Curated annotation (Swiss-Prot):
Record's subcellular location: Cytoplasm
Pathway assigned in UniProt: Amino-acid biosynthesis; L-arginine biosynthesis; N(2)-acetyl-L-ornithine from L-glutamate: step 2/4
Keywords assigned: Amino-acid biosynthesis, Arginine biosynthesis, ATP-binding, Cytoplasm, Kinase, Nucleotide-binding, Transferase
Top EC group: transferase
Protein name: Acetylglutamate kinase
Gene transcribed to yield this protein: argB
Protein family according to the UniProt entry: Belongs to the acetylglutamate kinase family. ArgB subfamily.
Reactions catalysed: N-acetyl-L-glutamate + ATP = N-acetyl-L-glutamyl 5-phosphate + ADP
One of the protein's GO biological processes: L-arginine biosynthetic process
Length: 292
């Protein structure tokens, strides 16, 4: 009986959040270990479908780095990286697009539909969803002078036409986006999935942006999880070394989304089953919330 009462209390804790977020949109970046573990894949699918059933629109943006690496290796293509970004020549871009749109996207869509959802897969090229420009990197040469480096078909989002997403949401569908964009000449670009999620969330004026990661969230210098960060505190946390390394671009993605009109952003440990529900529908949450 006690377990039943605990379940009822959990539902009651979620009720005010369900009321608050019903009819709103949440954009979720799906990547990392959550895409590889079968139990986590199932809990992710069930979380997303439950959100849709209770009236919360969800838009999924997925990654696919490990799958790309595996396929490139099979084709004998060796990748080079500049400041953590893959140099993407024409041959590499062909593989990247094939894997993200033809393999990973369809797997995510299939898994959601298998568990009762109505997911529709698309890339940024569909309906002109993601218009891109070439992303150039600045690196220091041997003399310590900054040089601009062309890293190929790697793009940055300059415009999001969210009309196709609004149409899909209105029809009861769950959009699943592969992070491939299109240039003004029709060329394909590979885009960082976190960036795509943030840009899409801003375009939709989403209630929340959630980044599923392989870490518990942002930690202080003592290793303790920071459950909440104010937007205005982020620059100082980067400057004092609290936010470092690969967490900087994720937090920057969140702050850009907040500046663009998203209400809250969350960095959540995707290795925890039902991480999305735990972050949204509990008073404490499990990750780091960033708010304006």
């Amino acid at each position: 009986m006690q377990k039943l009462i605990e379940k009822a209390n959990t539902l009651m804790e979620a009720l005010p959040y369900i009321r608050r977020f019903s009819g709103k949109t949440i954009v979720i970046k799906y990547g990392g270990h959550a895409m590889a573990d079968e139990a986590l894949k199932k809990s992710f699918a069930l979380d997303v479908i439950l959100l849709k059933y209770i009236g919360i629109n969800t838009v999924i943006v997925h990654g696919g780095g490990p799958q790309i690496n595996e396929t490139l290796k099979r084709y004998g293509i060796v990748s080079q990286f500049v400041k953590g970004m893959r140099v993407t020549d024409e041959a590499t871009m062909g593989v990247v697009e094939m894997v993200l749109t033809g393999q990973v996207n369809k797997e995510v869509v299939g898994y959601l539909n298998q568990h009762g959802g109505r997911a529709v897969g698309l890339s940024g090229k569909d309906g002109g969803l993601l218009l891109c420009k070439k992303l150039l990197q600045e690196v220091k040469n041997e003399q310590g002078v900054l040089e601009t480096v062309d890293i190929g078909f790697v793009g940055d989002v300059v415009d999001v036409d969210s009309s196709i997403l609004v149409t899909l949401e209105a029809g009861g569908f769950i959009p699943v986006i592969a992070p491939i964009g299109v240039g003004t000449g029709g060329e394909s670009y590979n885009i960082n999935a976190d960036v795509v999620a943030g840009k899409v969330a801003a375009a939709l004026k989403a209630e929340k942006l959630i980044l599923l990661t392989d870490v518990s969230g942002v930690k202080d210098q003592g290793g303790n999880l920071l459950s909440s960060i104010a937007l205005g505190d982020v620059p100082g946390l980067i400057e004092d070394g609290t936010i470092t390394g690969g967490m900087i671009p994720k937090v920057t993605c969140c702050t850009d989304a907040l500046t663009g009109g998203v209400h809250k952003a969350h960095i959540v440990d995707g290795r925890i089953e039902h991480a999305i529900l735990l972050e949204i529908f509990t008073n404490v949450g499990i990750g780091t919330e960033i708010q304006a």
